[in-house]
Amino acid sequence: MEALNARFNVLQEMLMDIYESGKEDLETQIEHWKLLRQEQALLFFARKHSIMRLGYQPVPPMAVSETKAKQAIGMMLTLQSLQKSPFGKEKWTLVNTSLETYNAPPAQCFKKGPYNIEVIFDGDPENLMVYTAWKEIYFVDSDDMWQKVQGEVDYAGAYYKDGTIKQYYVTFADDAVRYGTSGQYEVRINNETVFAPVTSSTPPSTGLRESSNASPVHDTVDETPTSTTATTTTFSTTTATATATGAPELSSKTGTRKGRYGRKDSSPTAASNSRKEVSRRRSRSRTRTRRREASTSRSQKASRSRSRSRSTSRGSRGSGGSVTTSRDSSPKRTRRGRGRGGRSRRSPTPTSTSKRERRRSRSRGGEPVSGGVGISPDKVGSRVQTVSGRHLGRLGRLLEEASDPPVILLRGDPNILKCYRYRDKKRKLGLVKHYSTTWSWVGVDGNERIGRSRMLLSFTSNSTRSQYVKIMKLPKGVEWSFGNFDKL
């Protein structure tokens, strides 16, 4: 313990020497990350051996120390690679080689010379966003060689060039759609308007969505001084509207370019009005024809059903002989009674009548009859979802609510219950649906806790709960019991 504290104090003193010296060489920055790695290794070792404090420094969890140690190793290797490049002799400060600067946009690059870019959306000075751009950017190309380029800004965003390809790390068009309504934005650097308002998003007439990585299109570029003292570069949007997708709006009918404030469609002529009137008349005539056909079919169906019911009733009354099915004197079709071996319609039996009555009662949404199917005892407590009250009677809802979710109630020391919950989750048995936090009962007259702490374990069915009880390994002093809830 004493040796560990002594080594930790030595590392702290060496780090303080680097901070106070303020050296700006790459060798010092590599040494700084090396000491940070050793510091995290000591903290990891201390926490592994249940040491919670080194001197005045609290020891973090092992996962935190492990993550920071890996980050320090990665930065140390990256700086060693940069040291072998032609840029290893330049000035490098602690800020330039910090992890935050390295991961800031553009990520995985070293940057120098930050400056701010102000973007105003919708022409509202209050709707302003500040971005950070960089003058010098160091990155590794596809050949694993370090390159140094100048950061640049245009109407689309901040970027740097990897060969001839622009690599944008800030895009204004995306935020123009997010923070603005009209899609216009204005770019300012050092309180000077560099780019005039640019329309970044308009609804395309074709209804198609294009690539969001393309840059806005402008047909003309005018460099004229504005009323202010700053010189502005104005990108005209009268001839082509730049969208958030970076393409001009196209007409859906002719396929030609159509400006945002372009000419509208011509007013309707007399010929077009007459064509519209003819189409209206045709649609009305079709509607009337459909209605007449529908009414005719309904009347025919009703007449057929009435004639069928009359013939059935007459056939059931006769015990034999021939029975005519039409009202006129000339018999057309006869049905033989049972006495002569012919066929006749069967009279409704009590079984079929009861089935029809049962179906009729169910269709009305009422309660099931006394002979309906209930719920078996082994199914009680098998439902987890809350029962809906729609389309259920009182008896139907009672049967549905009989399937309550089963639970197990644990009683014991709160810390022991928490440790058991943690270990049981690690086992990942897949039997427990939910674990509750530890809780306690309180009295009616005060807030004093009564008895030991409790914790609930819910299950999807009684079978899963039974399986869990067979393999359950409770700590000493923990009691358990079964239970059910109306809903969780």
UniProtKB/Swiss-Prot annotation:
<comment type="subunit">
    <text>Binds DNA as homodimer. Interacts with protein E1; this interaction greatly increases E1 DNA-binding activity. Interacts with protein L1; this interaction enhances E2-dependent replication and transcription activation. Interacts with protein L2; this interaction inhibits E2 transcriptional activity but not DNA replication function E2. Interacts with protein E7; this interaction inhibits E7 oncogenic activity. Interacts with host TAF1; this interaction modulates E2-dependent transcriptional regulation. Interacts with host BRD4; this interaction mediates E2 transcriptional activation function.</text>
</comment>
<feature type="compositionally biased region" description="Basic residues">
    <location>
        <begin position="278"/>
        <end position="291"/>
    </location>
</feature>
<feature type="compositionally biased region" description="Low complexity">
    <location>
        <begin position="312"/>
        <end position="328"/>
    </location>
</feature>
<dbReference type="GO" id="GO:0006351">
    <property type="term" value="P:DNA-templated transcription"/>
</dbReference>
<dbReference type="InterPro" id="IPR036050">
    <property type="entry name" value="Regulatory_protein_E2_N"/>
</dbReference>
<keyword id="KW-0235">DNA replication</keyword>
<keyword id="KW-0805">Transcription regulation</keyword>
<feature type="compositionally biased region" description="Polar residues">
    <location>
        <begin position="196"/>
        <end position="215"/>
    </location>
</feature>
<comment type="similarity">
    <text>Belongs to the papillomaviridae E2 protein family.</text>
</comment>
<keyword id="KW-1048">Host nucleus</keyword>
<dbReference type="Pfam" id="PF00508">
    <property type="entry name" value="PPV_E2_N"/>
</dbReference>
<dbReference type="GO" id="GO:0000166">
    <property type="term" value="F:nucleotide binding"/>
</dbReference>
<keyword id="KW-0238">DNA-binding</keyword>
<comment type="function">
    <text>Plays a role in the initiation of viral DNA replication. A dimer of E2 interacts with a dimer of E1 in order to improve specificity of E1 DNA binding activity. Once the complex recognizes and binds DNA at specific sites, the E2 dimer is removed from DNA. E2 also regulates viral transcription through binding to the E2RE response element (5'-ACCNNNNNNGGT-3') present in multiple copies in the regulatory regions of the viral genome. Activates or represses transcription depending on E2RE's position with regards to proximal promoter elements including the TATA-box.</text>
</comment>
<dbReference type="GO" id="GO:0042025">
    <property type="term" value="C:host cell nucleus"/>
</dbReference>
<dbReference type="GO" id="GO:0006260">
    <property type="term" value="P:DNA replication"/>
</dbReference>
<keyword id="KW-0010">Activator</keyword>
<dbReference type="InterPro" id="IPR000427">
    <property type="entry name" value="Papillomavirus_E2_C"/>
</dbReference>
<keyword id="KW-0678">Repressor</keyword>
<keyword id="KW-0244">Early protein</keyword>
<feature type="compositionally biased region" description="Basic residues">
    <location>
        <begin position="301"/>
        <end position="311"/>
    </location>
</feature>
<dbReference type="InterPro" id="IPR042504">
    <property type="entry name" value="Regulatory_protein_E2_N_2"/>
</dbReference>
<dbReference type="GO" id="GO:0006275">
    <property type="term" value="P:regulation of DNA replication"/>
</dbReference>
<keyword id="KW-0597">Phosphoprotein</keyword>
<feature type="region of interest" description="Transactivation domain">
    <location>
        <begin position="1"/>
        <end position="201"/>
    </location>
</feature>
<dbReference type="GO" id="GO:0003677">
    <property type="term" value="F:DNA binding"/>
</dbReference>
<dbReference type="InterPro" id="IPR042503">
    <property type="entry name" value="Regulatory_protein_E2_N_1"/>
</dbReference>
<protein>
    <recommendedName>
        <fullName>Regulatory protein E2</fullName>
    </recommendedName>
</protein>
<dbReference type="InterPro" id="IPR035975">
    <property type="entry name" value="E2/EBNA1_C_sf"/>
</dbReference>
<dbReference type="Pfam" id="PF00511">
    <property type="entry name" value="PPV_E2_C"/>
</dbReference>
<dbReference type="GO" id="GO:0039693">
    <property type="term" value="P:viral DNA genome replication"/>
</dbReference>
<dbReference type="InterPro" id="IPR033668">
    <property type="entry name" value="Reg_prot_E2"/>
</dbReference>
<dbReference type="InterPro" id="IPR001866">
    <property type="entry name" value="PPV_E2_N"/>
</dbReference>
<keyword id="KW-0804">Transcription</keyword>
<dbReference type="GO" id="GO:0003700">
    <property type="term" value="F:DNA-binding transcription factor activity"/>
</dbReference>
<dbReference type="InterPro" id="IPR012677">
    <property type="entry name" value="Nucleotide-bd_a/b_plait_sf"/>
</dbReference>
<feature type="region of interest" description="Disordered">
    <location>
        <begin position="196"/>
        <end position="384"/>
    </location>
</feature>
<feature type="compositionally biased region" description="Basic residues">
    <location>
        <begin position="332"/>
        <end position="346"/>
    </location>
</feature>
<feature type="region of interest" description="DNA-binding domain">
    <location>
        <begin position="404"/>
        <end position="488"/>
    </location>
</feature>
<feature type="compositionally biased region" description="Low complexity">
    <location>
        <begin position="224"/>
        <end position="245"/>
    </location>
</feature>
